[in-house]
Amino acid sequence: MPLLIEHGPTATTRQIAEAAGVAEGTLFRVFPDKRALLFAVAEHLLDPDRGEATLADAVADAADLESKVIATIEQSRTRMEQVLTVMTALRHIAHDEGGGDRPPSPPAFLVEANRRFLDAIADHVFAPHADELRVTPQEAALVLRSLVFGMWHPGTSAESRMSADQLASILLKGLAR
């Protein structure tokens, strides 16, 4: 997985096999092609149980809502960068295989992982502080996730990005003075 995160679509099956400590042919006994291998990696990376456990660990020691939100933003950013790298690799492979005429729909595991991660944010971060919110915990989770995605989207320049502290402040206190 780190190899794919580092190299994305340019990672070769030889590099992947070496990183896994197996012969390249072994990969193709398990996976029919590089696309299937990358999908398996993406599905592993997005494992909803692992995502929820990682989030729960990230916010476990946070005493207040702001600390939980900052920890969640930092954890979500790291996860999003990894996911975007792997999903970009998948998109390149689909395009190279002739599937580039229309945008592919997201794989079912991606939709499910996103839904469960939003539920985990709502449950672990916002539900314990529901009385401090003007919206439901689920709506707060969606807004947080949208801010993180927008701030660290590949099209956003590094100079324009705000820190987790800044995003948490905007999320919890708004934009107005």
Language model features by range: what are they?
Residues 3-36, 40:
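Helix-turn-helix
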Residues 5-9, 50, 54-57, 92, ...:
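Short, flexible helix-adjacent loops and helix caps
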Residues 34, 41, 45, 72, ...:
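Hydrophobic/aromatic residues within well-ordered alpha-helical segments
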Residues 67, 82-89, 97-131, 137-142:
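Amphipathic alpha-helical packing segments from all-alpha helical-bundle domains
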Residues 71, 78, 116-135, 141-177:
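C-terminal peripheral helix-coil segments that are non-catalytic and often amphipathic
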Residues 1-4, 76:
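Short hydrophobic clusters on alpha-helical segments that form packing/core surfaces
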Residues 43-75, 81-82:
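Amphipathic alpha-helical linker/stalk segments
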